[in-house]
Amino acid sequence: MKTLLLTLVVVTIVCLDLGDSLICYMGPKTPRTCPRGQNLCYTKTWCDAFCSSRGKVVELGCAATCPIAKSYEDVTCCSTDNCNPFPVRPRPHP
């Protein structure tokens, strides 16, 4: 009986693939499971022509390695579930 129980536990762990699936935000309220091998979440921000009125452009996603920031970008990476939430933007004052 103990052998059967142990076998069921092992099969469950293998089938669930525990610890291998990271969840990252892909948009403001859009968490998704990352593809296998992509074990980092990233947040990339930069200014475009509308930065003064709309704020920075934000890109969220999964990556195997942290993206290298270009000179005009800010990039942060993390490795826990939902660790890259959409940045909160201050509201403009009228």
Swiss-Prot record:
Chief location: secreted
Tissue occurrence: Expressed by the venom gland.
Family matches, as InterPro entries: Snake_3FTx, Snake_toxin-like_sf, Snake_toxin_con_site, Toxin_cobra-type
Domain of life: Eukaryota
Function: Binds with high affinity to muscular (alpha-1/CHRNA1) and neuronal (alpha-7/CHRNA7) nicotinic acetylcholine receptor (nAChR) and inhibits acetylcholine from binding to the receptor, thereby impairing neuromuscular and neuronal transmission.
Recorded family membership: Belongs to the three-finger toxin family. Long-chain subfamily. Type II alpha-neurotoxin sub-subfamily.
Record's protein name: Alpha-elapitoxin-Nss2a
Organism in which the protein naturally occurs: Notechis scutatus scutatus (Mainland tiger snake)
